[in-house]
Design a protein with these regions (language model features):
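Short alpha-helix in the alpha/beta-hydrolase fold that links the catalytic acid
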Residues: 247-258
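Short beta-strand element of the alpha/beta-hydrolase
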Residues: 112-122
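Short beta-strand/loop motif that positions the catalytic acidic residue
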Residues: 236-239, 243
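C-terminal catalytic histidine-bearing segment of alpha/beta-hydrolase fold enzymes
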Residues: 264-281
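Short amphipathic alpha-helix adjacent to the substrate-entry channel of hydrolases
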Residues: 129-150
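Gly/Ala-rich beta-loop-alpha elbow adjacent to hydrolase catalytic centers
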Residues: 187-196
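N-terminal cap/lid segment of alpha/beta-hydrolase-fold proteins
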Residues: 56-109
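Alpha/beta-hydrolase active-site loop
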Residues: 158-179
Length: 281
């Protein structure tokens, strides 16, 4: 399984940031409990920065091998619910950068919150809507959004540079037009983080963000000059301790630099597993 195709971390990391970002940015309440016993953090090995930095216990049998009925292909049924499929559609959004194909689950008009997930290299819009792969985490995100008046979107895009930025900025403009008061959380896996930082620096789209999630991803010093940084948009990093693509020491250094440049900035860092494939909670 490639670094870009994360297996277990994404859903519960989203759940963690729903409270972190939406409460900080808009005063919204946390989402109701949904399969929390299956997706909650295991033991905390260490904690620093008043809890903003945590190292989470990792066990391969518990967190990977024991979770799937068919290894890396189908999670055990107890981790998923197919209720949200009733709210799921393959759609095309019309944007200033042209049509953008995406999977959408939830309330497309007047959503209470919006989550966009941008895949890494080799992924596509279907990855973030798969119910049974990735430990059931995407299914959990889908249900948290669809069953609580939110909207979860996983788009296709042309690249991780100018064209992709234009498409995602256009998509954000389109979905915000249908739910102008909804906090919008942009989440990015692996190389998709290049677009997270580009959108943060986009003069219009960057100011519309309510939260950023970087999963096993990269860093960008340009963030410090971005509209998102100036707005103090909350940032959440989830990273593996031995990530072979994006070294954890560099991502940790970037986390520290954010705290140094803007004391009290709402930023959190979680370490679990060895790479993006093992991120779970």
């Amino acid at each position: 399984m490639s670094h870009e195709m994360s297996k277990h971390g994404i859903g519960s990391l989203f759940g963690a940031l729903f409270l972190f970002s939406t409460v900080t940015a808009s005063g919204a309440a946390s989402l109701p409990s949904y399969k929390d016993d299956y997706f909650a953090y295991p033991a905390i090995i260490s904690s620093a920065d008043n809890g903003d930095y945590k190292v989470i216990d990792y066990n391969e049998m518990r967190d990977i091998n024991g979770r799937d009925a068919v290894p890396e292909k189908r999670v055990k049924d107890t981790y998923v619910s197919l209720k949200a499929r009733a709210y799921q559609k393959d759609v095309t959004f019309q944007t200033a950068a042209g049509p953008v194909k995406a999977m959408a689950a939830g309330k497309r008009e007047g959503a209470s919150f919006i989550v966009l997930y941008l895949h890494g290299r080799g992924g596509n819009r279907l990855q973030g809507m798969n119910d049974f792969t990735f430990g059931g985490n995407f299914n959990r995100v889908k249900n948290l959004a669809a069953l609580n008046g939110g909207l979860y979107i996983t788009p296709d895009f042309k690249d991780f540079a100018d064209k992709g930025e234009a498409q995602i900025a256009g998509l954000i403009e389109a979905v915000k037009a249908s739910a102008p008061n909804a906090p919008l959380i942009l989440s990015c896996g692996s190389q998709g983080g290049a677009l997270c930082w580009r959108i943060a620096s986009n003069q219009k789209a960057g100011s519309q963000l309510a939260g950023l999630i970087l999963l096993g991803s990269l860093w960008d010093d340009g963030f410090f000059d971005s509209p998102a940084f100036k707005k103090r948009v909350p940032v959440f990093f989830g990273h593996g301790s031995r990530d072979p693509v994006f070294a954890i020491d560099k991502q940790e250094a970037f986390y520290r630099e954010i705290r140094k440049r803007a004391p009290g900035y709402p930023v959190q860092f979680r370490v679990q597993g060895e790479d993006l494939n093992q991120l779970r909670a």
